[in-house]
Curated annotation (Swiss-Prot):
Belongs to the class-II aminoacyl-tRNA synthetase family. Tetramer of two alpha and two beta subunits. Its EC number is 6.1.1.14. InterPro entries: DALR_anticod-bd (IPR008909), Gly-tRNA-synth_bsu (IPR015944), Gly-tRNA-synth_heterodimer (IPR006194). This is Glycine--tRNA ligase beta subunit. PANTHER family: GLYCINE--TRNA LIGASE, CHLOROPLASTIC_MITOCHONDRIAL 2 (PTHR30075:SF2), GLYCYL-TRNA SYNTHETASE (PTHR30075). SUPFAM superfamilies: HD-domain/PDEase-like. Keywords: Aminoacyl-tRNA synthetase, ATP-binding, Cytoplasm, Ligase, Nucleotide-binding, Protein biosynthesis. One of its GO terms (biological process) is glycyl-tRNA aminoacylation. The keyword ATP-binding applies. One of its GO terms (molecular function) is ATP binding. It comes from Shewanella sp. (strain ANA-3). It is found in: Cytoplasm. One of its GO terms (cellular component) is cytosol.
Amino acid sequence: MNFENLLIELGTEELPPKALRKLAESFLANFTEELTKADLAFKSAVWYAAPRRLAINVTELALAQADKIVEKRGPAVSSAFDAEGKPTKAAEGWARGNGITVDQAERLVTDKGEWLVYNAKVEGVETKSLIAAMAQRALDKLPIPKPMRWGSSKTQFIRPVHTATMLLGSELIEGELLGIKSARNVRGHRFMGTGFELDHADNYLTLLKEKGKVIADYESRKALIKADAEKAAAKIGGTADIEDDLLEEVTSLVEWPVVLTASFEEKFLNVPSEALVYTMKGDQKYFPVFDDAGKLLPNFIFVANIESKDPAQIIAGNEKVVRPRLADAEFFFNTDKKHTLESRLPSLETVLFQQQLGTLKDKVTRISALAAFIAEQTGANAVDAARAGLLSKTDLMTNMVMEFTDTQGTMGMHYARLDGETEAVALAMEEQYKPKFSGDTVPTAAVSCAVALADKLDTLVGIFGIGQAPKGAADPFALRRAAIGVLRIIVENKLPLDLVTLIAKAQELHGTNLSNANASDEVLEFLMARFRAWYQDKGIEVDVILAVLARRPTRPADFDSRINAVSHFRSLEASSALAAANKRVSNILAKVEGELPTTINSALLAEAAEQALAAKLAELQPQLAPLFANADYQQALTLLASLRESVDQFFEDVMVMADDEALKNNRLALLNNLREQFLHVADISLLQ
C-alpha cells in the first residue's frame, strides 16, 4: 500500500470559542497547501475542533513524493565545445557539478539554439520526514491576533499547548509542534473522560468518543446540539430560538454536549421579551423558547459540558444564575416606565455625539427636521416623522439600554407605546437602525424609512463635513454601513428621493458646523462607490454597473431600474453588436471639435443605409419618449435592440467622415441622435 491516513492533533487549554472554527479551518487550509507544495497526493482532508483541541485528518496520503525528472540545462553547445570539438571548461564544470561527464549530457534544441542538458532523476522524499515541519508552518500561519507564552518557553500560540500527536497510519511521526514532542497520548474530557494512547490514525474519533468522552467532530457536535435542543423545546410545547451564531459559540464551548431544559418565574414575562432574550442569549448562552404564536415561554434550553448523575442540580444552578439578570431587567423596566421618553430630551444635552457636530440633542433636532422633509417627499406623515426623529435617541438614556446596549431602539419602541405615542412613532424608534448588518431587512413603514434615512444622512454629511471620511479599513462611525443602508432603504422601498436634494438638506441643517466645503460632493461620490460595491455583492457584472454610473443618476430607485434594464439588455442577442456600435459611435463623436450637430436633414440622407437608420429612429422615438418618462428602461432598451440590423448596415455601407462637410455633419447628427437614445438609460458602449 502506497498511502496511509494521517492524524494530527494539538491538545491545548480552552480555545476562544468565537475563533475555534476559523482556527481549525485555517489549520486545515494551511496544511493542505503545504501538501500540495510538497507534491504529496491525498484523497481528502477534514478538520476537527473542540474546546481543548485542534485536529486534522488526511485520507490516503501518499507515503512518499513521486520520483521526478528535473531538467538541468547547461551551456549552449556553441560555447560548450572549442574549435576542435573538445569540451570547454564551462561545459566540464557544469557536467562535474551534476555528477556526469560531458559526453553523458543530452542535447536540447529550442528556437533560441541548442543546449547541453541533463535530465536528473530525483527520488521522492518519504512523507513522514516532512510532516512535522509542514504542520508547524501551517500553525505558524494561523490568524492569531494576540498570541501568548506559557511557562518558561518562548513558544507563542493562542493558548498553552500540552500535547501533540502525529500518526501516519499506526506509525508515530517524530518531531515537535510548538515545542511539544509528538506522542501517542491524547487527553480526554476534563472531568468525564480518560486519556489514552492512540494506536492508529483511523481510531481517533472512535476512541476519543468512547474513552475520552469528547465528540471531536465539530459539525456532528453542532448537529447533535441543535437536534436535542429542538426536541427539548418540543417537549414543553415550544420552539427553541437557535440562531446559528449562538449555536456555533455553544458548540465551541462544549466537548460532550448535554441539552437540558430550565425555567424562570412567569412574572418576568411582563418585561419586554427582547430584554429577556438579550440576557439569556448574550450573557448566558441559553436558547429561549417561544410558543406557536411567537410569545416567549418561561423556559430556556442550555447545554452542559458534562453528563451529571443529578441533572436537576445543574438545572437549578443555571436557573439561579439567570434569575438575578432577569430581575435586573425587570427593575430597569419598571424604573424606566416612571419617565416618558420626552422627559429625557434634556438629558441628551449631556451626551456628546461628536465634538464639532454637537450633542445628541443637537443630532435629534436635525434628524427631526430632516425626517419631516423626507416624509413630505414620500407621502409619509411628516408630523409623526418629526416626532419620531426628536425622540429617536431618548431610549439611550434609559437604565435598560445602558445595561443591555443591544436593546436600543427596541426598548424605545416599547417605551413609546407606553407613553401613548402613535404606532408609527413607536415602530420608527426600533427600525431607525435598520439595516444593522449585511443581509438584515430594511424598514418598510413610511415614517420608519424617513427617520432611518435622516439619521444615516445626518451622520454621513456631518462626518464628511468635518473632514473625517473613512480611510482604508478604518471606519469608526460605520459610514460604509450607513451609506449602504441609505441606498437599500430607498431602492427596496422604491422611494422617489434624490440623493443630491437629501445631502443638500442635511448640510443645511448642520449649519455652520461643517468645515469641509466639498462635503456634499464627497458624500455623493461615497454613495456612488457604495452603489458599485452593493451591486457587485449582488452578482451584477461590473461593466453593467459602470454603464449606469456613467450617467450619474442620483435617484437610487431610478439607478436600480437602470441596472435591471441593462442587465436584461445584456442577455439579448443584439446587445454585444449594439455595445460595439455604441463604442464606435462614441469614438467618432469624441474626435469632433466644437459642438456636435444635432439636427438631421432628411434631404441629405444620401445612402439607403442611413435613410433606413434615420427612419427606424424616427419610428421608435415616439414610442421611447413615454418609456423614458416613466423610467421603463427595460422596455426602452428592448425597443432599441431592434436597431441592430439598421446600425450594422449603416456602418457597413456609409462613410461617416465624408469629404462633403454637410453630409458629414448630417451623419454625425444621426449618430449623435442614436447615441442619445441609449444614453437616456446608460452608456452601453462600456459593456464588454
